[in-house]
C-alpha cells in the first residue's frame, strides 16, 4: 500500500481549503504544555479541508484498494511535531499541482539523539511518533477500536459493514472527531500517459470517467527513493473533471537516479482539524494503480 504519508499542495491550487496554525510549529515541550492547558480538548474536523504540509502532525486514513471490493483498512499515526524539513510553500505550482522541494540543511556540529542539522544551521528536533494513538470507527451503534502497539500507530482491517463511518482519533489527552464519511468509489476507465519516459518525464496526463459520487482525484509523487529527501509533487482536482495534467518541470526533479516513481492515484475525501498540538488530516480514499503507457 502506498503509505498515506503524503503532504499537500497550496490552498490556492487545490479544491480543498487548507487549515493553518496561527503561530509557527512549537517544539515538544511547548506542545506538551499546550496539551495540558488548551481548551477544548475535542476538535471537530472540517470536511473538505487539508493541513498545510509544514504543519501536519497526524494522518488518519480509511481506505480501499482497487480490485478488492468490500475490503477496507484503516490507519492512524501522530507525531509530536511537524517535519521541520518540509517547505512551507511550493517551489512551483499551478491550478492542480504543487512541487515541494525539501529545505536545504545547513551544516552544524554533532547533534544529540533525536536531533539533526536543520535549515537554520543548528541542531533541530525531529518528529517523534506518539505511542498512545487510538482510532475509533463508528457505524450506527457499533464501534471498532484500533490501538497503537508501538510507534507505527494504530492500524488494521475494518470489520464493520458498509463504507461510510464516523471516526474518532485519540492521543495525548486530545480527541479529533469526524462525522459519517463514505469511502469514494474506484474511478472507471482510468488511463495514463507519461511523455518523455521515466528518466526524463516531460508531462503526465491522466483521464477517467467522472463518477456519480465524485470526490477528489489526488496523487503524491515522491522523489526517487535513492535521494532520501522530503521532495515531492502533489496534485488534486475534482474527480468530476475527468482529466489531470502534470507539467514536466514538476516531474523532472523527481526522476533522479533510477527514474520517476509514480505510485498511482487516490480517489479521496479530505478533512482536517487544527488542534492545540498541530494539524491532523483525515482521508477516506480508494487507491488505484495506473499503467503509464508512453
Locate the predicted segments by residue:
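Ser/Thr-rich, Pro/Gly/Ala-heavy low-complexity intrinsically disordered linkers and tails
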Residues: 1-45
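Acidic, Ser/Thr
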Residues: 209-211
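Ser/Thr/Pro- and often Gln-rich low-complexity regulatory segments
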Residues: 38-198, 213-294
Amino acid at each position: 500500500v502506498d503509505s498515506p504519508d503524503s503532504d499537500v499542495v497550496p490552498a490556492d491550487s487545490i479544491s480543498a481549503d487548507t487549515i493553518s496554525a496561527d503561530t509557527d510549529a512549537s517544539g515538544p515541550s511547548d506542545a506538551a504544555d499546550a496539551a495540558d492547558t488548551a481548551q477544548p480538548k475535542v476538535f471537530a474536523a472540517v470536511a473538505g479541508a487539508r493541513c498545510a504540509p509544514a504543519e501536519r502532525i497526524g494522518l488518519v486514513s480509511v481506505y480501499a484498494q482497487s480490485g478488492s471490493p468490500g475490503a477496507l483498512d484503516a490507519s492512524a499515526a501522530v507525531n509530536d511535531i511537524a517535519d521541520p524539513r518540509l517547505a512551507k510553500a511550493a517551489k512551483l505550482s499551478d491550478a492542480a499541482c504543487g512541487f515541494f522541494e525539501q529545505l536545504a540543511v545547513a551544516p552544524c556540529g554533532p547533534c544529540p539523539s533525536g536531533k539533526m542539522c536543520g535549515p537554520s544551521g543548528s541542531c533541530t528536533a525531529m518528529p517523534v511518533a506518539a505511542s498512545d494513538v487510538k482510532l475509533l470507527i463508528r457505524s450506527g451503534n457499533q464501534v471498532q477500536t484500533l490501538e497503537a502497539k508501538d510507534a507505527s500507530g494504530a492500524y488494521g482491517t475494518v470489520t464493520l459493514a458498509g463504507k461510510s463511518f464516523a471516526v474518532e482519533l485519540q492521543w495525548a489527552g486530545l480527541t479529533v472527531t469526524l462525522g459519517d464519511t463514505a469511502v469514494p468509489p474506484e474511478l472507471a476507465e482510468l488511463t495514463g500517459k507519461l511523455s518523455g519516459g521515466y528518466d526524463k518525464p516531460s508531462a503526465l496526463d491522466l483521464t477517467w470517467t467522472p463518477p456519480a459520487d465524485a470526490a477528489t482525484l489526488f496523487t503524491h509523487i515522491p522523489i526517487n527513493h535513492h535521494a532520501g529527501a522530503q521532495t515531492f509533487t502533489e496534485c488534486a482536482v475534482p474527480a468530476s473533471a475527468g482529466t489531470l495534467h502534470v507539467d514536466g518541470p514538476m516531474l523532472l526533479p523527481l526522476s533522479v537516479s533510477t527514474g520517476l516513481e509514480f505510485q498511482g492515484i487516490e480517489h479521496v475525501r479530505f478533512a482536517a482539524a487544527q488542534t492545540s498540538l498541530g494539524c491532523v488530516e483525515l482521508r477516506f480514499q480508494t487507491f488505484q494503480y495506473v499503467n503509464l503507457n508512453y
